[in-house]
A protein has these predicted regions:
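Conserved catalytic segments around the Walker B and adjacent sensor/switch elements
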Residues: 2, 20-32
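A short helix-turn-beta junction within AAA+ P-loop NTPase domains corresponding to the substrate/partner-engaging
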Residues: 25, 120-137
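Central P-loop NTPase core of STAND/AAA+ ATPases
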Residues: 45-70
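Conserved P-loop NTPase "ATPase switch" module shared by AAA+ and STAND
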Residues: 66-88
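Conserved catalytic network of the ASCE P-loop NTPase/AAA+ motor domain
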Residues: 20, 65-70, 97-104, 122-128
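Sensor-1/coupling segment of RecA-like P-loop NTPase cores
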Residues: 2-8, 98-122
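Conserved NTP-binding/hydrolysis module of P-loop NTPases
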Residues: 24-27, 35-53
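C-terminal alpha-helical "lid" subdomain
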Residues: 9-17, 137, 141-208
């Protein structure tokens, strides 16, 4: 079992969805409204199983049977921090039961609070974790590489790097959204050089 944590906008979901294109990789994206039954149905759907009509226990057994018959699968549960709180751990216990009784690898991903929630409320799951990765965002060189090909003034480059790497609010998503608006402004004005003023204009189009 593996755990991947990182702040919103760091690229977890995009990366996991790309990986899920590989054979025998099943991907489920969770949300706050999911019940235990919804989670089971989402796993059934991503595996191509017909949605069951029995109890959750019977349907989970069907999922276990699938993994034990079709060996070599990886099950990715994204946004898993939305499944657990101090009031409910049932949905995560379903995942632990599938992992314990199936021949399947499981990767659970979410925001940093997922790590604390598992350690606090799900000790039996925590001691099953073989691999743990905490994403730290883009490096300065990665930002520079991403911006290659753009004509950027030095102060504009510094601002874009801050948007990508600031520990409080910086992330790839903010950098990408800013650049999208910058391109719109340049296209409308016929310009080619990204300046600090243009970045400020681009920011004015966003909710920051």
């Amino acid at each position: 079992m593996g755990i991947v944590v990182g702040r919103s906008g760091y690229g977890k979901t995009h990366t996991l969805k790309q990986y899920a294109r590989l054979p025998r990789v099943a991907y489920v994206e969770c949300d706050d409204t999911m019940s235990a039954r919804d989670l089971v149905e989402a796993i059934e759907r991503t595996l191509g199983l017909p949605s069951g009509y029995g109890t959750i226990w019977k349907r989970v057994n069907g999922i276990r049977d699938f993994f034990n018959t079709n060996r070599g699968y990886l099950l990715i549960i994204d946004e898993a921090d939305k499944l657990v709180s101090k009031y409910t751990q049932k949905k995560m216990e379903i995942l632990r039961a599938i992992y314990d009784q199936s021949d399947v690898g499981v990767v659970i991903a979410g925001e940093p609070k997922l790590e604390a929630a598992i350690k606090t409320y799900l000790v039996r799951m925590a001691n099953r974790v073989d691999f743990y990765a905490s994403l730290h965002g883009l490096s300065e060189q990665e930002v520079a590489d991403y911006l290659q090909g753009y004509d950027i003034t030095p102060d504009a480059l510094e601002e874009l790097q801050a948007r990508a790497r600031n520990r409080q609010t910086g992330c790839f998503r903010l950098l990408d959204r800013t650049l999208s608006n910058v391109r719109r402004i340049l296209a409308a004005s016929g310009g080619e050089t990204i300046t600090l003023k243009i970045i400020q204009q681009a920011s004015g189009m966003m909710m920051l």
